[in-house]
């Protein structure tokens, strides 16, 4: 029986295996999902913008969310469901984030297939499906999972050598509307497409059409952003971000950054600070699943380079730039590096593949590795993330709101105050 099971692991029906991984990922996330915890910070800002769109039936004319596509997407679902409590819509936002993180497994499998066969591609999506930090992040309801989905779709369609590659610029445009960091995804595929098409028939027309598709996607919201007071388009934000690194003799003026309600000064940005924190956080986010395999896989990719492998490396470098910028403040959060995780999964497959192929029973070894991945992930989540503390923090925040009129900051637990202090009556909130 055991021998038959291992032989069947040679994956003749990969769709069943993918669906099994999808189901396992969904079940694990729902186990840790707590409906009593509201959305907070950036996810709360997204929720507020979504409710505003839902209430007026269009984008507000007086302000624009810096990451508008996710709240626009949420507002469609807010229109479909009819809940009486605001908290129910917050939970809908979190559940949609969980579903998108699980759905990303499907295109990621076919992206892995560009480099490996079916059974090793399953290892890549399993790592992604149970990666502890991605699991925790998907429970928050923020933009990150939506953005990661578009990264995977961009790369998957870009590697297609038919006209489907044009879709990669559609997805890169959607990624940019989801988060401004998406423009770096666009830069990476635009550079690689130039080298892919160079010297071929209709090179210039194909290249310009690709760029045009991207700009058509982002232009409407970019124009709207420039017309809305105190709002920047993605290109204005890039220019202002670059300006942060240029020394100025004038007296510095504080500029507010939407992050945990903290004000940063322009002159606090330092390349040296970024160089200090970036490698430290890069190493930290690789624990526990990537730390032993992804660095090895990265160097093995470089050793036997081809255009597709080079595209992955170039994309990972470009997507690291926004993280380096964040750590230059420093904004000390690991989530700025989560956008690299789909590529990390692909890098991780190669050393696992080479290790298994050296064993006498590679399928059995591979099955053992996959079970170990799940075990390590669950163990890490159980010990690293204190979900009970978060639940208790919500209860404390409820007591504070009920019994006080003014509140002293006690971050990070106080992050729930703002979420719980809004009207819990959905009709009141929308009027």
Give the ranges of each region predicted by the language model.
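Hydrophobic/aromatic-rich transmembrane helices and adjacent perimembrane loops
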Residues: 144, 175-180, 184, 287, ...
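Membrane-embedded, lumen/periplasm-facing catalytic core of multi-pass transferases
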Residues: 372-431
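Transmembrane-helix motifs of polytopic, lipid-linked glycan transferases
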Residues: 19, 23, 92-115, 153, ...
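Signature aromatic-anchored transmembrane alpha helix within multi-pass, membrane-resident enzymes
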Residues: 19, 119, 170, 187, ...
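Short acidic/glycine- and proline-prone juxtamembrane loop motifs at membrane-interface regions
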Residues: 40-41, 66-67, 133-146, 333
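Membrane-lumen/periplasm interface segments of specific transmembrane helices
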Residues: 28, 205-295
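Membrane-interface alpha helices of multi-pass inner-membrane proteins
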Residues: 124-125, 157, 165-180, 186-190, ...
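Hydrophobic, aromatic-rich transmembrane alpha-helices
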Residues: 2, 106-108, 274-308, 315-319
